[in-house]
Amino acid sequence: MARKARLKAGDAIFHIMCKSITEVDLFRDCADKNKYLSLLKKYKIIYNVKIYGYCLMDNHAHLLIYANGADISKVMHGINFSYAMYFNKKYKRHGPLFKDRFKSLIVDNDNYLRTVSLYIHNNPTDIGEFKDCPEEYAFSSLGIYIGKRKDAFGVVDYDFVMSLFGNNLKKARQSYCSCILGCTDEKWKEEIEFEDETTDYKSERKILLRNFKSDDIIQFIASKMGISKILLHMKHNRKLVKSRALVVVLMRSLCNFKSSDICSILGNITQARTSKLCTIGVDLIISEKKYENIIGEFIENYS
């Protein structure tokens, strides 16, 4: 029987659930969960999506993601494929890790968004020691939402969801905590089912179109790095690695290009090298302050 095509609306918010195969825990230790969070950060940068919330349990993960013009299937493939490669190498295993495709539903109104966010953050109450204090669970974004913990990986964009609980952040956090403690898991399960749904829900979000020109990206990076744009097509020059890496990240993020497309544009480069440059570029954006808003700067200049 053919699989049902997944709805991939670029302007949608998705509640995503990833589950491991029956006999294997998705996360065996804290290091595994930290690795998954680092991959969320990486692919958030590459695809310019917004992650509204997450909760990583031992055998499954819940994510709340605004696609912002990206193809959600590509986003999740990047995250889960990279994690499966890491997991299989670490534990010297072969074969699939995830159970089928990820499950997803489209969040089609503000009330439903509130409910889904609360449902995700309520998951740790299934663990005995966190039954009455889910905010203490380190691998849920709840602690970040209510100001109890800093976002160590810089993953979560909680402002939009919190605005649905009030304009004053302090009061919104109090309201959020009250909702978490006052609602039963059974009630949420009645409202949340993983089915693809059509929607025209847009709220006040602006979608990022992925139709920027590669020539503009090359010119922008060349100007920012103080080099000739011709040099960005040169393969063997270690001094240009940072520049080429940033070009690759921006093309992946803003042009909806595949690795093969970027290979053709830069010339004389393999897909494996393109992937490596992308990783280098993401690391630069995360680790060096002067590059942390480089994607935003480009969008501001060329929109």
What are these regions (language model features)?
Residues 62:
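Conserved G/P- and acidic residue-centered "switch" motifs that form tight phosphate/ATP-binding loops
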